[in-house]
């Protein structure tokens, strides 16, 4: 006979949600930091061709 599963407690639900929110906040912070570093020119791991380089390649 089928028996219903026990209900997940509110505290366990809240702990899981808090973990998820913490991970999401950390990921958002990393993305914001990366965006700022790209805009200020501090990023070392990216290569963006400048307009001068593109004009030299076309010539």
From Swiss-Prot:
Residues 1-26 are annotated as: Disordered. Keywords: Ribonucleoprotein, Ribosomal protein. SUPFAM superfamilies: Zn-binding ribosomal proteins (SSF57829). The keyword Ribonucleoprotein applies. GO terms for molecular function: structural constituent of ribosome. One of its GO terms (biological process) is translation. InterPro entries: Ribosomal_bL32, Ribosomal_bL32_plant/cyanobact, Ribosomal_zn-bd. One of its GO terms (cellular component) is large ribosomal subunit. Residues 1-15 have a biased composition (Basic residues). Pfam families: Ribosomal_L32p. Belongs to the bacterial ribosomal protein bL32 family. HAMAP family: Ribosomal_bL32 (MF_00340). This is Large ribosomal subunit protein bL32. It comes from Cyanothece sp. (strain PCC 7425 / ATCC 29141).
């Amino acid at each position: 006979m089928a028996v219903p599963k026990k209900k997940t407690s509110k505290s366990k639900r809240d702990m899981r949600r808090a973990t998820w929110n913490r991970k999401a906040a950390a990921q958002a912070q990393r993305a914001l930091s990366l965006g700022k570093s790209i805009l200020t020119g501090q990023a070392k791991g990216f290569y963006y061709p400048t307009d001068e380089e593109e004009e030299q390649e076309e010539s």
